[in-house]
Design a protein with these regions (language model features):
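C-terminal "cap" of GNAT-fold acetyltransferases
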Residues: 153-182
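Short amphipathic alpha-helix that is part of the acyltransferase structural core
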Residues: 1-57, 190-193, 197-203
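Non-catalytic, surface beta->alpha helical segment in thiol-disulfide oxidoreductase systems
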Residues: 238-262
Length: 262
């Protein structure tokens, strides 16, 4: 068994999708999400250098880590200079879990963060922050990050590298008058699942209320639209929705309550 970690470049870019979308490579909706992410990865490569690392198990791409400077994302409110945002670590292959692929990816990022990252112009970063979530595959990211030495803070986890952790000031949500009697769902090109998920959200909202107007907004291309809504993933009738789509009963109830608000 041999594990190799490689930085993303134009030659291995498609391996990102062989990891993250390996079950949906021919799905038309997923391919649209892949197209958006492919363009974003190339844009980031050109402007910053590699923001993804891939783990290969005996030559096969099996896991990836996505990271980027926090101030490179236009819709992030009050970004912290010199801070690396760890978006995700993903290993979808059961036969490749428990072999250290994810750990090697994180260790590689930590090592370069202290010595100098290409996407920071060769400078070390101050600290790494992460927003863990649970894909339902393998161990939850929060648990994995804790095992790797990350600490918990309000709304994120962090690992100090060359400086002490500082929380980010976040804008509180302010209802937007133009969002009355309609829904706004945000998506971005950072993950190829984001756009397909936004389409699922729109479909679910139309099932709940066929008369509801639903607009999908690309946060990357329209950062101010995302910022003024506090980057909430879904707004219905000027009300942020907190229930997750997969919790159908809670989601439907919260959406209906928001629609009925005067």
């Amino acid at each position: 068994m041999y594990i190799e970690v490689r930085d993303l470049d134009e030659d291995n870019l498609e391996d990102v999708f062989r990891v993250c979308s390996h079950r949906k490579l021919e799905d038309p909706t997923q391919r649209k999400g892949m197209e958006l992410k492919r363009g974003w990865l190339l844009e980031m490569l050109d402007r910053y250098g590699p923001t993804t690392k891939l783990a290969y198990l005996d030559g096969k791409p099996v896991a990836q880590i996505l990271f980027y400077p926090e101030d490179s994302i236009p819709y992030v409110e009050n970004p912290r200079e010199g801070v690396m945002l760890l978006n995700c670590v993903y290993n979808p292959f059961p036969e490749a879990r428990g072999k250290g692929c994810g750990k090697l990816l994180v260790k590689s990022l930590i090592h370069e963060s202290s010595r100098g990252l290409g996407c920071l112009g060769g400078r070390p970063c101050r600290f790494i922050v992460a927003n863990p979530f649970n894909t339902g595959e393998g161990i939850p990211l929060e648990q994995f990050y804790s095992h790797m030495g990350f600490k918990k803070a309000q709304g994120e986890m962090y690992m100090e590298i060359t400086a002490s952790y500082q929380p980010r000031c976040r804008r509180p949500y302010t209802p937007q008058p133009e969002d009355r009697d309609r829904a706004i769902a945000l998506y971005n090109p950072l993950c190829e699942y984001s756009y397909p998920f936004a389409l699922r959200v729109k479909e679910s909202l139309n099932q709940i209320d066929p008369s509801l107007t639903v607009e999908l907004i690309d946060s990357w291309r329209n950062p101010q639209e995302a910022k003024k809504r506090g980057n909430h993933w879904l707004i219905v009738n000027s009300t942020p929705i907190t229930s997750f789509l997969l919790d159908r009963e809670a989601f439907s109830q919260e959406v209906l309550e928001a629609i009925r608000k005067k």
